[in-house]
């Protein structure tokens, strides 16, 4: 039952998948998709369905629907029917049909009475309206849809059309699918309209029911035709923007096809048959149309013979091959004559109106310097051709075009080559059988190898080493090695790249006239008349191949296979029969000296365009005198210097140093700051068809892709970023609490100002006639300022001074006025001169710069009036202040062009300051007078106080007497009386007081006799106080009652109360003032009297003090004047003093010597020009102690003076330079404190033994093996190295000797890290500054940013070698230490003969100059073997390894001395070392160390070492060098060989690019601006000094020296050298390399050491060592499981991948689970390779099985390998496996 259910389920799934992948379902799906391509035709259809009513409306609906369906049916038929597709697919067809019809329809709707003839009921088809509705829907359906573009659907349909067999069924089903989708869409629209009509909520709306709405609806219904006409007009304009207009677009002038050379019209198929030099957005329709015409109408066929041409290079000779002069032109050059006769008749009318060869689309024009016109990219990215895929013949869209053309050529040329048509089933079965057989063979071989390995066979025999191309598997017959594509290295030989044909000289021809070889394939394809010669079959020359082996690209010594002579003849019978030409006939040999190339004529654009920028620069004036065809960024050519009338002295000097072809003017290109909308498009192309920019605003400043819509500052209602809004609010809230950062504000303000300035400049530049208006205004403002305004101001100022009885300042003002200069500048601010205007200044713009602007001053101070402090402040302000400005249109001044106006110094500001100072002085003087008066008036105050006290005493006495008299007469008859008008409350209080007073008086009178006077007083007072208290309490109670009764006071009462309070307060203050005024007057009188008396006393004291101060100031002025004169004589410019200060500061700098190497120290010691080196040499050589008795006293005293040794410490021996001491010094620095692994990798084998033995080794810097010998010191002394002679400059040498000795001492004593360079000398071209200034921090990691090193640190010579190994890998994850040496970086040894025989030749760094002809620029070994990329990558990471000056100045190479001998001696060197280093091996010591190379060199010696190939190489090299030198001399006359060599290096071998500093760029521009002005001035001293003071001109970049090298520029930090990856040349060798290079990467992983190789891939010694070394680990396999081999690694990488692919693909179309069913049975046998089943438990066994036998069939890298091999895609980045997904997994029936 379960089986039955699974069977039913499987059938259902398969049935469903078949239905889904059927043609009908896919067609329905694509048809349904096209329903959503809503175009303008839907407007007419909806209009007919919605608006029209009645009988005529139904007829219109029917006609609209009919036309709509008919138009869509035409579109679907055009997919299958090619003529209809050609008619509708061309752009001019739509233009001719659509635009006139749109205009007709527009006028039809506007003027109905012209076309309305009325309607007849009998024959409605005569009604023109119904016919127009049908035509509208039919024609508009053919237009391009604009909501969902039909181009995407068309591409999908076209792709599917190639895949399916029943194409008509697919078209029909797609049309049915569209019809179903259209019916559903219309039904949905009808339902929506019915819902709107029936919805009460919409109909019951107040607005809809209003009369106004009804009126609007009726108007809308009446004007619907007008609205549709407007919409159609907009659509018409929209299409006009996207369709090229035949009249208004710009026509380009095409170059004549016959005018170019043959090289311009043809391109080699070997380089690129259809190179994508021109990137189009869409396919070229013309080529597709032609292909479809050929496919559909098979009658018209292109003659294939006319497509292919042969490109030959030879000299014209008197006789042809067969001796007939009439047949001198070959047959394949007769094509042009046929085309000329029928050229006019073949051109249709359309091409006269529409130039189909023009760029109508906004494409980019990509230049190709090698050819004249660019190749038309007519194939997009696909090339269609039939091929076998999965056993079936399919159309592949990524087929290699080279193979297709080659296959067609073979089909034409070989008549016997016919293909039998086989059915698809036979092909698939045959294909599957072949691959099944291959898989079985591979499986058997694989299992046999595993069994052999399990039995204990040798690894060398089991591993598969090579893969050969076998064309007969039964007999195991292979292709020859030289033509086997699976092989590489010396067996393939080396194909030499011939030089350009102009350089081939007669000597080269003579050396090569030994007979030429013609391949039989070339003879078949080229159809040459060589069959008339005698054909002599010669055996294959093995010697030529063996010689070629030496120059292979990836050379590896491989074991040769021997063939019998009969087998060789069979192999070469068809392909390699060699035709020997007549050796006596020299003319024939000359014709066949050069090679023949198979070419195919490719279509080219008939235009050679230049850009507007090139026209401005004037580079292509001679070559292309046409107008530019490419729109560049808006730019203007500004001439900044013209040398029309040079001075005689300057001109003669310039003439000697300059070439004759030097231009007399210098111009700069000024670019516009606006956003560039044109984007380098071609003139006449439609800008609206650009893909990326989308315009969604009314005015959009910058056009960009909608991809970056989220980064735009959008409006609030467009932005939905709530989190960003929260962040902004929080940020503002937090920023309020924090302090404001003023630096950021200033920076933002400057950015805003700069942006505003650029906007103003662009607005002036964009408007018409704006520059003319601005220029005229600037010139008038300049004249007004200079000659009218400023002289008037001077006149007014001096006249006012004369009126105020002061001396006028005519001379000072006129001097400042004359100093002001109005310099005319370009629009960017480049200065020209006062009188010379820039060229085309009215159109290009002008700036006027004012130097030393005049400011009116109220007075001029004397030079010695200010103090020294004020003068220093003034100079400081002057340095910061700019003494120039730019003039604006309004007469204002700005610091930068179009900047904001500056504030002028005020005329009245110094006057106000002076007044304030004087007022302050008066105040201080008055205060002093008052103080003195106060001090002196104390005496008078004492007297006044005594008088005052006496008067008061007398007054008190008189007052007491008066009181006594008043007591006796209490009732006063006379007294004043006051009358008041009081209110009721006050009257009551007065009455009560009177009553109380009367009572008291009565009591007094009653008790007069009984009590005394004092007692009565006290009692009376007590009683009065009590009564007053009681009254106060009563009054307060009354007030409370009143307030309770009246809650709200009136406004008048409040006003009265407030006025009362104010009056009372004023009364109190007034009484207080009256009371205290007496004391105030007294105080004033006292102060005045004191001041007067003090002033009188101190008058003589003040006068004497002023007298002494005036004398002192006069003396100070005179002293300061003398000092100033002395300073002027010493330092005329303050900037020179700053330079001196910098130099003096450098002397005091301290440096750390911890990073100095011992080699550097002793090398510097070797350069000392005095004889003190011998003392140190004697001590170091004999290794004696300085305290011994055998050392001379002179040597002891020398070392004691130098501080190396102190003689008093007798127990301390001399710190000699043995390795032990040197090790101790190294251990003190952590960068040298390396582990044992690193030391094992850093040193050679001899050093390893010494380190393991812990023995002392002598100093490596003085041994013969590593560095400088005794003899080399003499050679160094002979060389100058740009130093002064020791005899002429002894003082300099003495100082240098001292410093170098100090270096030696500091290197031996590392504890003292710093020293002071108090000796005033700059070492060897700023040696200290360049090498040591950044070394005061220990550790090399912190100085990796350095880009230059002093070249004198180590003098490398790349001709002999010393071993130093880079790329040390100290990371070891495994338990053992791998001490094998992978590679070596070669550094030189110097011998006497080399120094004596040095000859300046081409630059030979990294072997670039050896075999210049054959050496390609791109070294492809570095891409797959990064460990070989020694110098460039090492230098990139560690720039202190190789000095920079060496890269540019060491051009010495010993080439011509015994070249034949060196070639014999050098033997065989693998090409990877040869390519990267190019060194010769001449030393005996290295011959012994590299003895394994001699095995190959002995083999080469046995053969003919001086063969024709080496001679040919030598001759070509020499001739090429001579021709290159002649070429360079004709172009440019160099001053020295160094300049010529450097130019050759930079142009041809520039592996490093030079980049200057970003700060240096601005300095250069500023200097150029100043130079342009200084050149035109007669006396430029003042301007030069002021520009240096302002910082406009930089002295550090001035080229003062004549021979200024690149190394010095790099030392200054101006130029920076950077490694750069070179561009790839797509030539034939690259294609061959890419096809072969993939297996080489995997094979290289098995390589261990280049030195220890013989013939195999695995070194026996290392393998045996590893076996013995790790035997104890690998014997017990239970404990440790080392996967030394994954079993599939037994096969070669290519066979391994083939095996995987054959297993992964189901050849017999089984289910996925049965793919590896056969192979799974053998998995159990594979476990015996490494382990036995007895010794393993289940978990480990499963783990190893999982690890070893997880076949990577689903890995991406394997898919990429399949992609590379099967689909001809060599670039991994363009991963085209995605295209495979376009084919469905299941077959289509």
Swiss-Prot record:
InterPro entries: TIC214. GO terms for cellular component: chloroplast inner membrane. It comes from the Eukaryota. The chain crosses the membrane at residues 19-39, 68-88, 91-111, 133-153, 176-196, 227-247. It is a multi-pass membrane protein. Disulfide bonds: none annotated. It holds the Pfam family Ycf1. Keywords: Chloroplast, Membrane, Plastid, Plastid inner membrane, Protein transport, Transmembrane, Transmembrane helix, Transport. GO terms for biological process: protein transport. The keyword Transmembrane helix applies. It is found in: Plastid, Chloroplast inner membrane. Involved in protein precursor import into chloroplasts. May be part of an intermediate translocation complex acting as a protein-conducting channel at the inner envelope. There is a partial copy of the N-terminus (positions 1-341) of ycf1 in the inverted repeat (BAF50246). Belongs to the TIC214 family. Part of the Tic complex. This is Protein TIC 214. It comes from Capsella bursa-pastoris (Shepherd's purse). The lineage of its organism: Eukaryota, Viridiplantae, Streptophyta, Embryophyta, Tracheophyta.
């Amino acid at each position: 039952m379960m089986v039955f259910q699974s069977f039913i389920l499987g059938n259902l799934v398969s049935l469903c998948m078949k239905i889904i992948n059927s043609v009908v379902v896919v067609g329905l799906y694509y048809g349904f998709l096209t329903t959503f391509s809503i175009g303008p035709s839907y407007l007419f259809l909806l209009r007919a369905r919605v608006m029209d009513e009645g009988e005529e409306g139904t007829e219109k609906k029917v006609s609209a629907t009919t036309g709509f369906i008919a138009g869509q049916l035409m579109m679907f038929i055009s997919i299958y029917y090619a003529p209809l597709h050609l008619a509708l697919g061309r752009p001019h067809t739509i233009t001719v049909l659509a635009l006139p019809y749109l205009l007709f329809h527009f006028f039809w709707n506007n003027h109905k009475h012209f076309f309305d003839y009325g309607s007849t009921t009998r024959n409605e088809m005569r009604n023109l309206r119904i016919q127009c509705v049908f035509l509208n829907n039919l024609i508009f359906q053919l237009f391009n849809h604009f909501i969902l573009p039909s181009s995407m659907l068309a591409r999908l349909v076209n792709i599917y059309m190639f895949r399916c067999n029943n194409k008509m069924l697919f078209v029909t089903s797609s049309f049915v699918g569209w019809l179903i989708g259209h019916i559903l869409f219309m039904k949905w629209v009808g339902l929506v309209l019915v819902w709107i009509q029936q919805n009460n909520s919409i109909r019951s709306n107040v607005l809809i029911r209003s009369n106004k709405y009804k009126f609007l609806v009726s108007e809308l219904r009446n004007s619907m035709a007008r609205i549709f006409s407007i919409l159609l007009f907009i659509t018409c304009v929209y299409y006009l923007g996207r369709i090229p207009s035949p009249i208004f677009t710009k026509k380009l002038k095409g170059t004549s096809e016959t005018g170019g050379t043959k090289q311009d019209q043809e391109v080699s198929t070997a380089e690129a048959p259809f190179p994508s030099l021109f990137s189009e957005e869409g396919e070229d329709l013309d080529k597709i149309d032609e292909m479809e015409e050929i496919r559909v109408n098979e009658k018209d066929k292109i003659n294939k013979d006319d497509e292919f041409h042969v490109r030959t290079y030879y000299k014209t000779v008197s006789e042809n091959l067969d001796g007939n002069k009439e047949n001198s032109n070959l047959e394949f050059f007769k094509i042009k004559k046929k085309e000329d006769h029928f050229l006019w008749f073949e051109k249709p009318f359309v091409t006269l109106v529409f130039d189909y060869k023009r760029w109508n689309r906004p494409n980019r024009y990509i230049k190709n310097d090698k050819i004249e016109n660019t190749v038309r990219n007519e194939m997009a990215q696909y090339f269609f051709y039939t091929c076998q895929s999965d056993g079936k013949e399919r159309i592949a869209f990524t087929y290699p075009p080279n193979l297709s053309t080659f296959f067609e050529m073979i089909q034409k040329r070989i008549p016997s080559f016919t293909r039998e048509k086989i059915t698809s089933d036979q092909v698939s079965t045959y294909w599957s059988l072949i691959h099944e057989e291959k898989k079985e063979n591979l499986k058997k071989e694989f299992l046999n190898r595993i069994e052999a390995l399990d039995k204990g066979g040798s690894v060398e025999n089991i591993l598969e080493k090579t893969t050969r191309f076998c064309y007969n598997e039964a007999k195991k017959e292979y292709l020859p090695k030289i033509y086997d594509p699976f092989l590489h290295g010396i067996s393939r030989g080396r194909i030499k790249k011939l030089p350009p044909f102009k350089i081939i000289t007669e000597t080269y021809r003579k050396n090569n006239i030994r007979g030429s070889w013609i391949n039989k394939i070339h003879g078949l394809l080229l159809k040459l008349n060589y069959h008339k010669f005698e054909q002599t079959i010669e055996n294959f020359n093995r010697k030529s191949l063996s010689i070629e082996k030496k120059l292979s690209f990836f050379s590896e010594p491989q074991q040769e296979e021997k063939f019998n002579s009969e087998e060789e003849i069979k192999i070469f019978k068809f392909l390699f029969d060699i035709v020997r030409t007549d050796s006596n006939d020299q003319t024939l040999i000359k014709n066949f000296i050069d090679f023949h190339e198979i070419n195919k004529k490719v279509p080219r654009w008939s235009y050679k365009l230049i850009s507007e920028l090139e026209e401005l620069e004037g580079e292509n004036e001679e070559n292309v005198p046409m107008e530019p065809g490419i729109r560049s960024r808006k730019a203007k050519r500004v001439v900044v210097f013209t040398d029309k009338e040079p001075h005689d002295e300057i001109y003669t000097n310039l003439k000697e140093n300059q070439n004759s072809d030097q231009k007399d003017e210098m111009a700069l290109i000024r670019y516009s700051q606006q956003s560039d909308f044109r984007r380098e498009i071609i003139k006449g192309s439609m800008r609206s068809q650009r893909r990326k920019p989308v315009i969604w605003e009314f005015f959009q400043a910058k056009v960009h892709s909608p991809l970056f819509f989220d980064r735009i500052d959008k409006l609030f209602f467009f932005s939905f970023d709530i989190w960003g809004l929260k962040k902004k609010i929080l940020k503002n809230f937090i920023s309020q609490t924090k302090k404001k950062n003023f630096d950021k504000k200033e920076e933002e303000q400057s950015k805003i100002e700069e942006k505003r300035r650029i906007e103003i400049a662009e607005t002036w530049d964009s408007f018409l006639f704006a520059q003319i208006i601005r220029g005229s205004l600037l010139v008038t403002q300049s004249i007004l300022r200079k000659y009218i305004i400023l002289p008037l101001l001077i006149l007014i100022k001096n006249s006012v001074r004369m009126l105020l009885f002061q001396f006028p300042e005519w001379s000072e003002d006129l001097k400042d006025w004359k100093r002001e200069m109005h310099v005319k500048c370009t629009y960017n601010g480049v200065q020209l001169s006062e009188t010379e205007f820039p060229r085309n200044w009215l159109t290009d713009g002008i700036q006027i710069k004012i130097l030393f602007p005049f400011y009116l001053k109220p007075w001029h101070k004397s030079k010695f009036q200010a103090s020294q402090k004020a003068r220093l402040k003034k100079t400081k302000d002057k340095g910061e202040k700019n003494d120039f400005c730019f003039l604006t249109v309004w007469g204002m001044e700005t610091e930068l062009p179009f900047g904001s106006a500056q504030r002028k110094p005020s005329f009245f500001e110094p006057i106000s300051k002076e007044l304030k100072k004087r007022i302050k002085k008066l105040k201080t003087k008055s205060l002093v007078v008052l103080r003195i008066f106060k001090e002196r008036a104390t005496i008078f105050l004492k007297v006044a106080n005594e008088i005052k006290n006496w008067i008061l005493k007398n007054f008190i006495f008189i007052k007491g007497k008066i009181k006594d008299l008043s007591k006796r007469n209490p009732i006063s008859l006379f007294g004043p009386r006051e009358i008041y008008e009081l209110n009721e409350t006050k009257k009551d209080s007065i009455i009560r007081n009177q009553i109380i007073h009367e009572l008291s008086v009565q009591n007094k009178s009653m008790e007069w006799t009984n009590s005394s006077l004092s007692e009565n007083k006290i009692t009376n007072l007590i009683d009065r106080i009590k009564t007053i208290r009681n009254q106060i309490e009563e009054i307060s109670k009354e007030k409370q009652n009143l307030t309770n009764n009246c809650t709200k006071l009136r406004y008048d009462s409040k006003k009265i109360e407030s006025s009362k309070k104010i009056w009372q307060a004023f009364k109190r203050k007034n009484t207080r003032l009256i009371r205290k005024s007496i004391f105030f007057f007294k105080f004033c009188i006292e102060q005045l009297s004191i001041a007067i008396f003090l002033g009188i006393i101190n008058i003589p004291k003040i006068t004497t003090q002023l007298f002494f101060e005036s004398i002192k100031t006069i003396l100070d002025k005179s002293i300061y004047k003398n000092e100033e004169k002395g300073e002027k004589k010493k330092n005329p410019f303050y900037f020179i003093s700053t330079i001196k200060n910098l130099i003096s500061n450098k002397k005091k700098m301290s440096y750390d010597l911890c990073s100095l190497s011992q080699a550097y120290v002793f090398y510097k010691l070797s350069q000392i020009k005095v004889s003190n080196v011998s003392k140190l040499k004697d001590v170091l050589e004999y290794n004696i102690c300085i305290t011994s008795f055998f050392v001379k006293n002179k040597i002891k005293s020398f070392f004691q003076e130098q501080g190396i040794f102190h003689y008093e410490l007798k127990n301390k021996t001399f710190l000699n330079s043995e390795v032990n001491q040197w090790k101790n010094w190294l251990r003190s620095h952590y960068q040298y404190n390396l582990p044992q692994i690193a030391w094992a990798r850093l040193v050679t084998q001899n050093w390893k033994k010494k380190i393991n033995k812990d023995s002392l080794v002598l100093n490596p810097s003085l041994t013969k093996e590593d560095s400088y010998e005794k003899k080399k010191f003499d050679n160094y002394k002979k060389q100058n190295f740009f130093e002064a002679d020791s005899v002429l400059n002894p003082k300099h040498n003495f100082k240098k000797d001292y410093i170098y000795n100090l270096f030696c001492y500091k290197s031996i004593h590392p504890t003292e890290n710093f020293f002071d360079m108090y000796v005033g000398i700059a070492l060897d071209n700023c040696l200290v500054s360049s090498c040591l200034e950044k070394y005061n921090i220990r550790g090399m990691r912190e100085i990796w940013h350095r880009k230059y090193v002093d070249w004198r640190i180590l003098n490398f010579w790349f001709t002999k070698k010393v071993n130093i190994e880079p790329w040390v890998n100290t990371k070891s994850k495994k338990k053992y230490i791998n001490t094998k040496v992978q590679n070596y970086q070669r550094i030189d040894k110097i011998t006497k003969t080399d120094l004596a025989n040095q000859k300046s030749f081409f630059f030979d760094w990294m072997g670039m100059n050896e075999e210049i002809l054959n050496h390609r620029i791109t070294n492809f070994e570095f891409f797959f073997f990064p460990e070989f990329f020694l110098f460039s990558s090492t230098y990139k990471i560690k720039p202190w390894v190789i000095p920079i000056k060496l890269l540019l100045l060491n051009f010495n190479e010993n080439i011509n001395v015994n070249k034949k001998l060196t070639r014999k001696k050098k033997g065989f060197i693998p090409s990877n070392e040869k390519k990267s280093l190019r060194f010769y091996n001449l030393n005996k010591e290295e011959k012994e160390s590299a003895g394994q190379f001699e095995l190959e060199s002995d083999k080469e010696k046995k053969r003919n070492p001086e063969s024709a190939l080496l001679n040919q190489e030598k001759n070509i090299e020499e001739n090429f060098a001579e021709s290159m030198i002649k070429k360079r001399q004709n172009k440019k006359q160099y001053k020295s060989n160094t300049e010529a060599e450097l130019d050759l290096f930079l142009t041809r071998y520039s592996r490093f690019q030079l980049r200057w500093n970003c700060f240096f760029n601005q300095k250069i521009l500023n200097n150029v601006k100043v130079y342009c002005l200084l050149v035109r001035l007669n006396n430029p001293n003042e301007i030069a000094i002021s520009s240096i003071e302002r910082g406009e001109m930089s002295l550090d970049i001035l080229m003062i020296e004549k021979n200024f090298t690149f190394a010095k520029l790099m030392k200054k930090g101006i130029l920076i050298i950077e490694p750069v990856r070179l561009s790839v040349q797509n030539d034939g060798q690259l294609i061959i390399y890419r096809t072969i290079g993939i297996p080489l990467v995997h094979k290289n992983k098995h390589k261990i050491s280049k030195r220890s190789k013989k013939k195999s891939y695995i070194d026996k010694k290392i393998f045996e060592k590893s076996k013995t070394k790790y035997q104890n680990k690998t014997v017990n396999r239970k404990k440790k499981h080392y996967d030394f081999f994954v079993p599939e690694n037994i096969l070669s990488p290519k066979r391994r991948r083939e095996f995987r692919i054959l297993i992964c693909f189901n050849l017999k179309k089984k289910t996925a689970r049965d793919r590896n069913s056969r192979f799974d049975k053998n998995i159990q046998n594979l476990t015996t390779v490494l382990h036995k089943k007895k010794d393993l438990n289940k978990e480990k066994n499963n783990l190893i099985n999982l690890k070893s036998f997880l076949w990577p069939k689903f890995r991406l890298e394997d898919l990429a390998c399949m992609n590379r091999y099967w689909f001809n895609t060599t670039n991994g980045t363009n991963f085209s496996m995605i295209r495979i997904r376009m084919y469905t997994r299941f077959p289509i029936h």
